[in-house]
Amino acid sequence: MLSPEVRALVKATAPVLKEHGEALTRHFYTRMLGGNPELRQLFNQGHQQSGQQQQALAAAVAAYAEHIDDPSVLLPVVERIAHKHVSLGVRAEHYAIVGKHLLASIREVLGEAATDELIDAWAAAYGQLADLLIGRERALYAAAASRDGGWTGWRAFKVVRKTPESAEITSFYLAPADGGATPDYLPGQYVSVRVYVPELGLMQPRQYSLSEAPGMPGQLRISVKREAGSPAGMVSGTLHNRINEGDVLDVSPPQGDFTLDAEDGRPVVLLSGGVGLTPMVSMLNHLTARDDGRQIRFVHACREAGVHAMKEHINALAAKRPNVRKAVFYERVGADDRRGVDYDYEGRVDLHAIRDEVILPDADYYLCGPLPFMQAQRRALADLGVAEHRIHAEVFGTGGVA
């Protein structure tokens, strides 16, 4: 437990961190990765070069300082971070390295304002946060290892099938190279996949949602969008262009806290933009495989027909099951696109226009897609009277709807 004096000192830095947080985190990453270059393989170099990683850490540090009197407010964020750390193979010993460079960066960036007393206070606060994360991650590692077919760290998987789903998205069916079993997982969870990127001279990890329902014997499926640019798209480009059937990938055990509550029986509305449909398809397939009779709505946004993935599969489920209804939005409708078959609505997703279809009593709403898409749907759901605790969200990327 932190003393009142320590909490007061840390909290007093929150305004400074909000103003100068990115300068601090840029300095921190340069310092830490310069002194520990092996850690570059843990970090998404695309996010490093775009500044996204620095922005995210700056926001997290400022939020921790602001809520130091009641860090329980941040527990949902801590849970999400812990799942990602386990997926990446972050271990307890890494926290000492981070702490060393974070405290040194605070001193070097804040200068005379970083008194010994302030550094000691931040050391105590960081220690509290590190202990919380280490404890939760230890439990997640143990759970991953104890499942039938489970493991920790990286495991070799062979690509047994590679299937294009659209002009931009390709599915990879992965089976353990050792011939062993694969573990069960929750619909909505993801794995990390690690590949060598020659242009960077590094192994690089990325997280990809499992896009099939749990229970596919001896296999896992990920569906990967080819991202543009370098280095942001280097891993997806490597998977699309260089990885073929028979090749081997490093894969982490399934993790993630964005998961379907399949047992409560409430109606489910699945809202996705672009490649954000991948966890939604896992959820939809899980529910329909169980012959779950609850009302299910599948709302999806994409730019145009060429990038519309898994269309035939979704259409078949909706045609066969009266409790499943779809609403597909195309931003650009082509001359050959058929309303009711290829798409249902033109333009961007407008929940107000389809409120009678998607606003269901006591429903749970699952959202996944680019950040602007997510923000727009959250606002619309709030305007339509959906309670905040009924909205469950996962953010994919930072760009537009794919």
UniProtKB/Swiss-Prot annotation:
SUPFAM superfamilies: Ferredoxin reductase-like, C-terminal NADP-linked domain, Globin-like, Riboflavin synthase domain-like. FAD binds at residues 190, 206-209, 395-398. Transmembrane segments: none annotated. The keyword Signal does not apply. Its cofactor is heme b; FAD. The active site is at residues 95, 137. The keyword Transport applies. It catalyses: 2 nitric oxide + NADPH + 2 O2 = 2 nitrate + NADP(+) + H(+); 2 nitric oxide + NADH + 2 O2 = 2 nitrate + NAD(+) + H(+). Keywords: Detoxification, FAD, Flavoprotein, Heme, Iron, Metal-binding, NAD, NADP, Oxidoreductase, Oxygen transport, Transport. It holds the Pfam family Globin. Residues 1-138 form the Globin domain. InterPro entries: Cbr1-like_FAD-bd_dom (IPR008333), FAD-bd_FR_type (IPR017927), FNR_nucleotide-bd (IPR039261), Globin (IPR000971), Globin-like_sf (IPR009050), Globin/Proto (IPR012292), Hmp (IPR023950), OxRdtase_FAD/NAD-bd (IPR001433). The record marks 29 as: Involved in heme-bound ligand stabilization and O-O bond activation. The record marks 84, 394 as: Influences the redox potential of the prosthetic heme and FAD groups. NADP(+) binds at residues 274-279. GO terms for molecular function: FAD binding; heme binding; metal ion binding; nitric oxide dioxygenase NAD(P)H activity; oxygen binding; oxygen carrier activity. It comes from the Bacteria. GO terms for biological process: cellular response to nitrosative stress; nitric oxide catabolic process; response to toxic substance. CDD domains: flavohem_like_fad_nad_binding. PROSITE patterns: FAD_FR, GLOBIN. Residues 152-261 form the FAD-binding FR-type domain. Heme b binds at residue 85. Consists of two distinct domains; an N-terminal heme-containing oxygen-binding domain and a C-terminal reductase domain with binding sites for FAD and NAD(P)H. Belongs to the globin family. Two-domain flavohemoproteins subfamily. Is involved in NO detoxification in an aerobic process, termed nitric oxide dioxygenase (NOD) reaction that utilizes O(2) and NAD(P)H to convert NO to nitrate, which protects the bacterium from various noxious nitrogen compounds. Therefore, plays a central role in the inducible response to nitrosative stress. This is Flavohemoprotein. It comes from Bordetella parapertussis (strain 12822 / ATCC BAA-587 / NCTC 13253). The gene is hmp.
